[in-house]
């Protein structure tokens, strides 16, 4: 730590007051990214700041931790809570709060391990809020893949690194300038980001056709559906508990989404019978979990319709899936059902 950083921490210990260098979060900036950037601007590491405040070295912040950090960094606490992934429980199941809503799919948000676009960091200097979406594996601005590991040492990135664009090994982060994502992936990320932000519009002008019913679902549901369609390389491949509950690496998630998009092109119209070879590749448990745990009725109805289309091979009783209510008829029609 620099001498200036040591002095700042000593001051904080003697007189718990906001750090001297203060600034506002950038547009669409991640909460943890802002804390990392603000700590750096004050000459201390984020890890050291957590230590001196008596908080655990963890990106999972409690309500008390949020309040202490918001006061110390002098940022609005409500904004920090909005822009930070906060774990919790609902009906006995783990869930997350982020962007003012509840997320029930355990694979939707990165949380503990960040992913970044080094080109954005070099140009703008801030970690974006959208990068918290585990399925947002590409940068819409530069058309390149995001990274979650250091290209120099190979270690996974953490929120406790020295700066937003520097790994714990001390090297700056970078990405191959020739690496480009496919049109289909750009369309997917655009839709995911648009639905997560509530804008209802994709962040890309791609003409790639996604299933029309993607437009009305939450980003949480889109991630669960993509995982169910893409996690298996082939029919009946075993999916471990860890694979179904822990967000995969960015590279692994990219492969999952690429397979899912290929298979989902055959699911544009769910009124057409499901191909038998496709049915064998879908991991239905993720859809059942979405149907049982999600609070959003549109998302639950979508999961139910897909399960009915697949024939619900898992032995569960398809009759237990209720038909949509009158306010979900438009969605059900989009999915190929009868009103």
Give the residues covered by each predicted segment:
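Basic, alpha-helical nucleic-acid-binding regions used in initiation and control of genome expression
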Residues: 1-339
